[in-house]
């Protein structure tokens, strides 16, 4: 005990001497030291880290806490490519105080997506971002077992029979937008210019709300209610990921919008209960009939309302971005537009047949266009999990400690020539049956929301994998298929003089085209009334 006291006393004496010397310095030198010391500590820490053979190599950085945030945030795929050449498929970097361990390629997909629930957590990685937008008790603000059951509840409304009923509803909304939106007004105009990042988010939310949430909720989007969705949407930004709550105006608007929208859903739910008006019209009816967990606990109306927000907002960004990218790629490929048009005319008998869900399945080129767009533009360039227990990386000496995050990027793999020859070229025919690579579905597993492929080592994973795989894949293909079918049959489009496909904007949470992203459209049949 006396020895310990002696050591502590001696240490305090040195601290006091150092502090005295520091206070004796001129003010300018003291300020300089305060600034320099964190940088020195940061460099020393990195040097000591590099000596550890049980850690993946760390990307060197100069600015404490910030780390590699700027270069990663601006051009993530270029950042991954440079790091891969230097370190291989496994490396770490610092992102705003977090250590992110990246594992690139199909083996990385397997390592992260099929990791044990006890080892990694999506909830711990994302809850601070999603809960203020979606609300309490759903998605990532609940135990994983609850989330798996919530996905099962929602999946009950995403059946083949439901999709058959959605197709005419989605088509009706697209034609209505073509007629009434100031961006088109096709009954008054034969040509015009649009910014796809204005039109596609609107068309996506109109079609999704009409099909999934019913006529009553869709009608509200024609009022000021639409501005609430816009305010809520602005809660999905990188600054919200880093700082979930700040005393800023857009945070206050986000919180107000969440309460107002969930309150509107709750009013509709209560009205249907009161009138015993629960049918099979939409997702709201489906959740009101089937939202009891295995342990007998029922979701509250507030939780159902929050889950409805999560379903609509969760798919809104990704489908809007994908439809925008499709239009942009086709704008410089009139040959592909013509191929798609001929397929439409063939399947729909020259336009005599009404589009149906079954007929959508007979349009391989249309579906390959969606598939190729998702390959080139994965909606999310990075997917995270927080490490909860130390994880050994198979066939290496690396151990990823608890508290770190693991990061996987299927979008980066999608753009590697080793998996997709000429990967940066838009080529819908790479998916032809006689030329497309065949990826085995393999063993299936049920995480609680229905059986899905357990294999996630495929280089093509546009909807993620494992227990957090997106359940909206078939709805996305249905929605995008109807949308693009009508675009192709109704319009032709091209770029303004000197323009081409814009580069991706990686500064948002979803990979969007850099704006403005304008195309010039013209009606195929100027006399046609919509």
UniProtKB/Swiss-Prot annotation:
<dbReference type="InterPro" id="IPR002403">
    <property type="entry name" value="Cyt_P450_E_grp-IV"/>
</dbReference>
<keyword id="KW-0752">Steroid biosynthesis</keyword>
<comment type="function">
    <text>Sterol 14alpha-demethylase that plays a critical role in the third module of ergosterol biosynthesis pathway, being ergosterol the major sterol component in fungal membranes that participates in a variety of functions. The third module or late pathway involves the ergosterol synthesis itself through consecutive reactions that mainly occur in the endoplasmic reticulum (ER) membrane.</text>
</comment>
<keyword id="KW-0444">Lipid biosynthesis</keyword>
<dbReference type="InterPro" id="IPR001128">
    <property type="entry name" value="Cyt_P450"/>
</dbReference>
<keyword id="KW-0256">Endoplasmic reticulum</keyword>
<keyword id="KW-1133">Transmembrane helix</keyword>
<dbReference type="InterPro" id="IPR017972">
    <property type="entry name" value="Cyt_P450_CS"/>
</dbReference>
<comment type="subunit">
    <text>Interacts with ERG28.</text>
</comment>
<dbReference type="InterPro" id="IPR036396">
    <property type="entry name" value="Cyt_P450_sf"/>
</dbReference>
<keyword id="KW-0349">Heme</keyword>
<feature type="binding site" description="axial binding residue">
    <location>
        <position position="470"/>
    </location>
    <ligand>
        <name>heme</name>
    </ligand>
</feature>
<keyword id="KW-0560">Oxidoreductase</keyword>
<dbReference type="Pfam" id="PF00067">
    <property type="entry name" value="p450"/>
</dbReference>
<protein>
    <recommendedName>
        <fullName>Lanosterol 14-alpha demethylase CYP51</fullName>
        <ecNumber>1.14.14.154</ecNumber>
    </recommendedName>
</protein>
<feature type="binding site">
    <location>
        <position position="126"/>
    </location>
    <ligand>
        <name>lanosterol</name>
    </ligand>
</feature>
<keyword id="KW-0812">Transmembrane</keyword>
<keyword id="KW-0443">Lipid metabolism</keyword>
<dbReference type="GO" id="GO:0016491">
    <property type="term" value="F:oxidoreductase activity"/>
</dbReference>
<dbReference type="GO" id="GO:0005506">
    <property type="term" value="F:iron ion binding"/>
</dbReference>
<feature type="topological domain" description="Cytoplasmic">
    <location>
        <begin position="42"/>
        <end position="530"/>
    </location>
</feature>
<dbReference type="InterPro" id="IPR050529">
    <property type="entry name" value="CYP450_sterol_14alpha_dmase"/>
</dbReference>
<comment type="similarity">
    <text>Belongs to the cytochrome P450 family.</text>
</comment>
<keyword id="KW-1017">Isopeptide bond</keyword>
<keyword id="KW-1207">Sterol metabolism</keyword>
<dbReference type="GO" id="GO:0020037">
    <property type="term" value="F:heme binding"/>
</dbReference>
<comment type="pathway">
    <text>Steroid biosynthesis; zymosterol biosynthesis; zymosterol from lanosterol: step 1/6.</text>
</comment>
<keyword id="KW-0753">Steroid metabolism</keyword>
<keyword id="KW-0597">Phosphoprotein</keyword>
<dbReference type="GO" id="GO:0005783">
    <property type="term" value="C:endoplasmic reticulum"/>
</dbReference>
<keyword id="KW-0756">Sterol biosynthesis</keyword>
<feature type="cross-link" description="Glycyl lysine isopeptide (Lys-Gly) (interchain with G-Cter in ubiquitin)">
    <location>
        <position position="454"/>
    </location>
</feature>
<dbReference type="GO" id="GO:0008398">
    <property type="term" value="F:sterol 14-demethylase activity"/>
</dbReference>
<keyword id="KW-0472">Membrane</keyword>
<keyword id="KW-0408">Iron</keyword>
<dbReference type="GO" id="GO:0006696">
    <property type="term" value="P:ergosterol biosynthetic process"/>
</dbReference>
<feature type="topological domain" description="Lumenal">
    <location>
        <begin position="1"/>
        <end position="20"/>
    </location>
</feature>
<dbReference type="GO" id="GO:0005789">
    <property type="term" value="C:endoplasmic reticulum membrane"/>
</dbReference>
<feature type="binding site">
    <location>
        <position position="314"/>
    </location>
    <ligand>
        <name>itraconazole</name>
    </ligand>
</feature>
<keyword id="KW-0503">Monooxygenase</keyword>
<feature type="cross-link" description="Glycyl lysine isopeptide (Lys-Gly) (interchain with G-Cter in ubiquitin)">
    <location>
        <position position="353"/>
    </location>
</feature>
<keyword id="KW-0832">Ubl conjugation</keyword>
